[in-house]
């Protein structure tokens, strides 16, 4: 079920919130778990069994660690093998079989497994929980219902943010529900819906135009790269806003997942602002345990390559995703060794550098093959004897320039800063009075787009 779908907005969500707020305080986690299971089972009920098995083994491993502390390492290893084994079987089996066939020349049939929605996200949450219990950073959760509610919580279940157990554990036991929190959560949810429906979906129309175009030009390829990069940002940050907003309505405080990454002055900073929950997960559970940067140069380079190769592989079972991760690893390596010092001396050029590198990275991210990525990157550089533009390109530029401009400005802190400045002035009270009306109007416009449009799944649902 999609957050940006009519059944969710007008059937599931009102019923879920009604059940949640009518439930007594001691049963709210049970009500949340029930709603989350219904939400997850809506499309593919059988996948609930995969998630239930993953939750049960994580729960058992953590409880056994406290009971048998001398066997903590063995229990952690078994739990990690089970969690990653389930993820690997569902997500990477066909990738490995294809690679085996390519190397050996055999024709082992593919399993063609349907990927359970959100498995990459809830697997990482289970892993972080078990590791935190192993390290002594958190006690094992005694209530299976509370642990399952944390892992299966429908606001963040299928596309994050990846919520740490240590961050949310106190809120599972005791949280407050206020009208102000509900209002702020609803505001965040509607704004996220607007990002998805009015920006991400419209930007993807331009991506589709490029993909279906028989005559490509240099300018059209640059427009495609910009549209796709902004589409991914507004699609995923929009979902994160909706998840954070829903959590706030129910008394949870989730950490931010995006902080205006396109204003970064380096790619190192970019990844501190983009998909923050994933980056911090790999930092704390992979990079630092490998030794981080406090090792000799050769080992540090290897650590960086491993982490970014895994980051790419987490996004998808294809070599293009692995190369996408290694692409960033190379840039981060150069920034650490010498490029960072140069960028600090060139404040204007460093932003051009970040945006250009990011544009080419998203061409690789979207490509179905390495040859397709090379072809698109070559077109952006004017290779292949393509025209710079043609009549069709100018038509699409005229048609999509407003949404590209709106998305470009909207991806910066400028709109939020402008709203804060207005709110601090004489017009602040007027703005406060008009905000609920504006949000209702935005919801109505989004609903109209959804009624007239087709299915629009969130990009990160497939991860």
What residues fall within each predicted segment?
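Membrane-embedded transmembrane alpha-helical bundles that form the catalytic cores
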Residues: 1-462
């Amino acid at each position: 079920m999609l957050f940006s779908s009519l059944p969710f907005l007008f059937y599931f969500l009102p019923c879920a919130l009604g059940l949640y707020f009518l439930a007594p305080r001691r049963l709210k986690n049970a009500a949340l778990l029930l709603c989350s299971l219904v939400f997850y089972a809506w499309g593919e009920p059988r996948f609930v069994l995969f998630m239930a098995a993953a939750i049960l083994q994580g729960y058992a491993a953590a409880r056994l660690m406290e009971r048998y502390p001398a066997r903590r390492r063995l229990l952690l290893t078994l739990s990690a093998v089970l969690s990653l084994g389930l993820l690997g079987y569902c997500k990477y089996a066909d990738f490995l079989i294809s690679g085996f066939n390519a190397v050996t020349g055999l024709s082992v049939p593919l399993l063609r497994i349907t990927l359970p929605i959100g498995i990459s996200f809830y697997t990482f949450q289970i892993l972080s929980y078990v590791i935190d219990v192993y390290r002594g950073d958190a006690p094992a959760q005694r209530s299976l219902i509370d642990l399952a509610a944390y892992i299966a919580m429908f606001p963040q279940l299928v596309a994050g943010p990846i919520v740490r157990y240590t961050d949310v554990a106190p809120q599972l036991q005791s949280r407050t529900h206020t009208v102000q929190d509900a209002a702020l959560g609803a505001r965040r949810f509607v704004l996220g819906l607007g990002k998805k429906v009015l920006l991400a979906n419209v930007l993807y129309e331009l991506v589709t135009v490029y993909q279906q175009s028989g005559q490509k030009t240099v300018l059209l390829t640059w427009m495609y790269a910009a549209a796709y990069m902004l589409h991914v940002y507004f699609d995923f940050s929009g979902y994160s806003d909706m998840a954070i907003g829903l959590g706030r309505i129910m008394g949870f405080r989730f950490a931010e997942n995006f902080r205006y990454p396109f204003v970064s002055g380096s790619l190192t900073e970019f990844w501190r602002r983009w998909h923050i929950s994933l980056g911090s997960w790999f930092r704390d559970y992979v990079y630092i345990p490998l030794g981080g940067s406090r090792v000799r140069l050769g080992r540090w380079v290897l650590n960086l390559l491993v982490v970014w190769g895994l980051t790419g592989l987490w996004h998808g079972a294809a070599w293009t995703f692995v190369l996408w991760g290694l692409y960033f690893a190379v840039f981060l390596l150069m920034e650490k060794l010498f490029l960072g010092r140069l960028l600090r001396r060139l404040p204007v050029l460093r932003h051009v550098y970040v945006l250009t590198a990011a544009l080419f990275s998203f061409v690789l991210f979207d490509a179905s093959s390495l040859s397709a990525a090379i072809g698109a990157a070559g077109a952006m550089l004017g290779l292949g004897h393509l025209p710079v533009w043609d009549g069709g390109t100018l038509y699409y530029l005229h048609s999509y320039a407003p949404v590209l401009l709106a998305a470009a400005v909207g991806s910066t802190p400028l709109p939020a800063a402008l709203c804060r400045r207005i709110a601090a002035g004489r017009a602040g009270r007027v703005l406060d009075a008009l905000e609920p009306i504006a949000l209702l109007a935005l919801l109505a416009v989004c609903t109209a787009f959804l009624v007239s449009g087709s299915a629009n799944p969130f990009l990160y649902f497939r991860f």
